[in-house]
Amino acid sequence: FIMNYYSLNKYLKNTFGEKVYKISLNGNMTCPNRDGTLGTRGCIFCSRGGSGEFASDALLPVHGQIDQAKLRIKKKSDCKKFIAYFQPFTNTYAPIEYLEKIFTDAISEPDIVALSIATRPDCLGNNVLGLLEKLNKIKPVWVELGLQTIHEKSANYIRRMYPLSVYDSATENLHKIGINVITHIILGLPSESKEMMLESVKYAGSKTDGIKLQLLHVLKNTDLCDDYESGKFDVLSMEDYIDILCDCVEVLPENVVIHRLTGDGDKKLLVAPMWSADKKRVLNSINREFAKRDITQGRKAK
């Protein structure tokens, strides 16, 4: 069965000629939404691990984390190329000398073919942009931005703590220096209709090189979990999620790389929706529905 969308796997094979694995690294960062600069409680859905439950051990230096991750991957695959992905918290929120050291350490490994940095659009000052531009001349650099929604009411609810205009200028600045932008969008935020979610996806699709579509997960020990357990909102059913996903893929321009169609929360922390824990079943159901509806990326893109 042919997937009629531009998946990350397709992009990686086109770009690097073979399968490439992403290694999640821990840069030992914090976030302005946690250290008191903008807030202390983080985004409403964010776990204590800073949404990096699968990242390596922060106590190890970068080279050690990469070696550890490679050993794990090589048990199940003969993959020879890797992407260094700095995942938890805000990975440009540290002194520039420190950032230069950890990012340079990561890309100095010969089998690391690209660097991916998850951060906030309000943490991309000129000094950071200068560093990223320099690194991008050595190996490709991607920047991942957690936009999540374009709707102000939802952005306030999730405590994103920056306006849409900040995302816009960050994507512009990154594109000016030749850096690929990957935008995260959450599907299933409380009080958002399907139309609202599609508006966010369309908007991101017009600004970004890649997109991660993420089901809203409720994780233990988050403020979102308190709201969920007190009955303030419901999570999406698998059928509703897949229905929304079908439309999301069709409204995305065909050149936008789809990095993720669901996302899997840490099973130990997951409170809802429990169906999302069975990743294999979810992906099979998505593929079946895509085939049934003959879903084609870009068909409804304007």
Predicted region positions:
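N-terminal [4Fe-4S]-dependent radical SAM core
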Residues: F1-I83
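Auxiliary Fe-S-binding modules of radical SAM enzymes
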Residues: I2-K10, K19-Y21, H217-K302
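Hydrophobic faces of well-ordered beta-strands that scaffold small-molecule active sites
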Residues: Y21-L25, F82-A84, L115-I117, V141-L145, ...
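Core AdoMet radical
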Residues: G49-A69, K76-I96, D111-L124, P140-V166, ...
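Short amphipathic alpha-helices and their capping/turn segments at secondary-structure boundaries
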Residues: A69-I73, L124-I138, S169, L198-K207, ...
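Acidic (Asp/Glu)-rich catalytic clusters
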Residues: I73-K75, I102-P110, G130-P140, E172-K176, ...
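Short, electropositive alpha-helical surface patch
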Residues: E100-T104, E133, S193-D209, E239, ...
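Conserved C-terminal portion of the radical SAM core fold
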Residues: S165-D223, E239-T262
